[in-house]
């Protein structure tokens, strides 16, 4: 009797998201759906990294065969510092949400948050060309979105923040990009001095999570203004409720941005960008069920 030849099952390509906390993460579900849609075979898990142990957790993951990783709060800046090479978006954002282990063993970092935002905005609003846009907030979420918005050819990008100097610092940084190509489109304005109606208002702050609002004048909202909150939930966020009360034409939450940035990450790793509409509907339905 001859021995049957042994058959080895190839190891799954492993991916993960690192954060702390991480139990709430929808990334494993999203990437699992993307894998099914694109007929890719892979695994994707959520990893709780110790606050003081992100680098060790990440390197252990890569040493064990990990191919790529997403990074969420509070580790995006640490991930940036660990990269051997970076995309233009990541370099200017000063933060990374997507890591790839390259064939030579080095780590490449990208920031797909802004790309996900712009993809979702275009899906809802069409072209962003020539639009007058207000970006509320000057933290990491805002910083990661500025270059993609400028590349989408917005007409004007006004940045406002409770601390005016932080908004001005971002304008100073991005005014230098590509030999000042975007300098005439960028402006920092204090919240109390905002004037005129905007075509699009984007809230990058997390104020809605606490049911709070940035101190904005209702005069910035017109009957054709679209408002976008990067936060999301089963019900309209506090910011989007306020925008509707001021007569905004349309309000959009950040669930599509979450799915959009995941699709960009998936494309970086797998070479194919999945359609997001079906996954977005599944997540939206799940939010409603979980809220009941």
Curated annotation (Swiss-Prot):
InterPro entries: Aminoacid_DH-like_N_sf, NAD(P)-bd_dom_sf, SDH_C, Shikimate_DH, Shikimate_DH-bd_N, Shikimate_DH_fam, Shikm_DH/Glu-tRNA_Rdtase
Alphabetized UniProt keyword annotations: Amino-acid biosynthesis, Aromatic amino acid biosynthesis, NADP, Oxidoreductase
Reactions it catalyzes: shikimate + NADP(+) = 3-dehydroshikimate + NADPH + H(+)
Active site per UniProt: 76 (proton acceptor)
GO cellular component: cytosol
Superkingdom in the source lineage: Bacteria
This enzyme's EC code(s): 1.1.1.25
Pathway: Metabolic intermediate biosynthesis; chorismate biosynthesis; chorismate from D-erythrose 4-phosphate and phosphoenolpyruvate: step 4/7
UniProt-listed GO biological process terms: amino acid biosynthetic process; aromatic amino acid family biosynthetic process; chorismate biosynthetic process; shikimate metabolic process
Chain positions recorded as NADP(+) binding sites: 137-141, 161-166, 230, 254
One family name in Pfam for this protein: Shikimate_DH
One GO MF term: shikimate 3-dehydrogenase (NADP+) activity
Binding site residues for shikimate: 25-27, 72, 97, 113, 232
Chain's role: Involved in the biosynthesis of the chorismate, which leads to the biosynthesis of aromatic amino acids. Catalyzes the reversible NADPH linked reduction of 3-dehydroshikimate (DHSA) to yield shikimate (SA).
Entry-linked HAMAP family: Shikimate_DH_AroE
Membership in a protein family: Belongs to the shikimate dehydrogenase family.
SUBUNIT field: Homodimer.
NCBIfam families: aroE, PRK00258.1-2
Protein name (Swiss-Prot/TrEMBL): Shikimate dehydrogenase (NADP(+))
Gene: aroE
């Amino acid at each position: 009797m001859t021995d049957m030849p042994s058959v080895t099952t190839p190891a799954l390509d492993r991916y993960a998201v690192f954060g702390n906390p991480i139990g709430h993460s929808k990334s494993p579900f999203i990437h699992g759906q993307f894998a099914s849609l694109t007929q890719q075979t892979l695994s994707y898990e959520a990893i709780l990294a110790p606050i003081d142990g992100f680098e060790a957790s990440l390197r252990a993951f890569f040493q064990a065969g990990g191919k790529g990783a997403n990074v969420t709060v509070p580790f995006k800046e640490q991930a940036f510092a660990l990269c051997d090479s970076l995309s233009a978006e990541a370099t200017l954002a000063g933060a990374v949400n997507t890591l790839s282990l390259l064939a030579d063993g080095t780590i490449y970092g990208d920031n797909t948050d802004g790309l996900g935002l712009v993809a979702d905005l275009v899906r809802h609003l069409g072209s962003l060309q020539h639009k007058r846009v207000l970006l509320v907030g000057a933290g990491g979420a805002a910083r990661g979105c500025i270059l993609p918005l400028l590349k989408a050819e917005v007409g004007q990008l006004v940045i406002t923040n409770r601390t005016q100097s932080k908004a001005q610092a971002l304008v100073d940084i991005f005014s230098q990009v590509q030999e000042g190509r975007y300098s005439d489109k960028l402006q920092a304005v204090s919240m109390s001095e905002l004037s005129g109606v905007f075509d699009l208002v984007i809230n990058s702050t997390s104020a809605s999570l606490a049911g709070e609002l940035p101190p904005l004048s209702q005069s910035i909202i017109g009957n054709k203004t679209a408002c976008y909150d990067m936060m999301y939930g089963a019900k309209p966020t506090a910011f989007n409720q306020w925008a509707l009360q001021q007569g905004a034409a349309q309000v959009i939450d950040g669930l599509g941005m979450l799915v959009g940035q995941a699709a960009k990450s998936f494309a970086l790793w797998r070479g194919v960008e999945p359609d997001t509409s079906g996954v977005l509907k599944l997540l939206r339905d799940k939010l409603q069920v979980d809220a009941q």
